[in-house]
Regions:
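Glycine-rich beta-strand-to-loop/alpha-helix junction loops that act as flexible
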Residues: 37-39
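Catalytic core of pol beta-like nucleotidyltransferases
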Residues: 1-32, 42-47, 56-105
């Protein structure tokens, strides 16, 4: 899995802004690691694609608050999954195609 540099020209302005906003909110809520997966990570996204995020480290009591804040800030569909709850082929696919947005060192 590679680290995605959000300062490059991978995404158009509004999508980049939305991804940065989501990552910032999740960091604020205690995320230890944030992974972008799905069409945005693969590069085959459309203008209306949702933001698929896999996260580690957000306490259960903060999860829904973080999700609500992400939805309000971005005005686009956001899917946030806890990496600890993902298994099998889906987990392997995220590890293979995912791009690390943030990792607490």
């Amino acid at each position: 899995m590679e680290r995605l540099l959000l300062t490059d020209r991978t995404f158009s302005g509004d999508i980049l802004q939305a991804i940065q906003g989501v990552a910032s909110i999740l960091q604020h809520h205690g995320a230890m690691k944030i992974i972008l997966y799905g069409s945005l990570a693969r590069g085959d996204y459309r203008a209306d694609s949702d933001i698929d995020i896999c996260v580690e480290g957000i306490p259960d009591e903060n999860y829904f608050r973080a999700l609500a804040e992400c939805l309000m800030k971005t005005q686009r569909r956001v899917s946030i999954l806890d990496f600890q709850n993902i298994q099998g082929d889906f987990r392997e696919r995220i590890l293979k195609e995912g791009k690390i947005l943030y990792k607490r060192e």
